[in-house]
Design a protein with these regions (language model features):
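A glycine-rich, aromatic-flanked flexible loop/lid motif
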Residues: 123-126, 163-167, 194-204, 229-233
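Accessory "access/gating" subregions that flank catalytic or transport cores
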Residues: 116, 120, 135-136, 151, ...
Length: 234
């Protein structure tokens, strides 16, 4: 996800799962997708400084304030993001860990540990300002359960602070099980991963391009339309 903004489009299918496609530039009017309402997602901390929110715009930040390599929290960045007029201000990224080979229980543990540390630092009010970014692997039923388990564990944590919050989950297809020389297989795997995320109850889904090298407009369009096909098939 190298682009600065992603647009998430809400689908009123039976799964009620928004989905997204990648933009390399700023906001645009995609009238052909009239059935879907645009929901901008910020993934670049430098861009966030220049965004002017409007009454009809809802920005969701996927920017993680934790340095997973150093194991530290960037408190100043967190304060700057919380000062923004976003719908949700801070991302908790555990897709990095899935793509690095972490087990499901490790991914969930890291997500909850990050949440607890943020809550202790900024108070319980931060719980409804978080976006969980997760990657969905090939183990269909286990990945479906991972999404639901994250909802349950987060909700249980919020109850410890006297709240009853449900997490906002942004799920994307995994990169770990994709191959440069097997594009068709990548397409099949990512479709199953999307289905697992949607059935599991993710609030938004994103498809990484199935062509790991020499990606083009056609491959981007096909990757995006995977999500549309699943929404209508449901």
């Amino acid at each position: 996800m190298d682009s600065l903004l992603h647009y998430v489009h809400a689908s009123f299918s039976s799964l009620l799962t928004p989905f997204s496609f990648s933009l390399s530039q700023g906001p645009a009017n995609y009238s052909q997708w009239a059935r879907f309402s645009p929901l901008p997602v910020v993934v670049n901390k430098d861009l966030s400084e220049h965004i002017k929110t409007e009454d009809d715009s809802r920005y969701f930040s996927l920017i993680d304030v934790f340095d997973d390599n150093a194991g530290t929290l960037n408190e100043q960045l967190a304060k700057e993001l919380l000062a923004k007029d976003f719908e949700r201000n801070i991302g908790i990224d555990v897709s990095f860990h899935q793509n690095s080979g972490a087990a499901i229980y490790q991914q969930l543990g890291i997500a909850i540990a990050k949440t607890k540390e943020l809550t202790e630092l900024f108070g319980k009010e931060i719980l409804n300002q978080l976006v969980f970014r997760i990657a969905i692997g090939a183990n269909y039923f286990f990945e479906m359960s991972k999404v639901r388990a994250l909802k349950l564990t987060f909700n249980q944590l919020s109850k410890e602070f006297g709240l009853d919050e449900i997490p906002y989950i942004f799920a994307e297809t995994s990169l770990r099980n994709k191959a440069k020389n097997d594009e068709e297989n990548n397409l099949i795997r990512s479709t199953l991963e999307l289905a697992a995320a949607m059935i599991g109850g993710a609030d938004a889904v994103f498809t990484n391009d199935y062509k790991l090298q020499n990606a083009n407009e056609l491959s981007e369009e096909i990757s995006f339309k995977q999500q549309i096909v699943l929404a209508y098939e449901s």
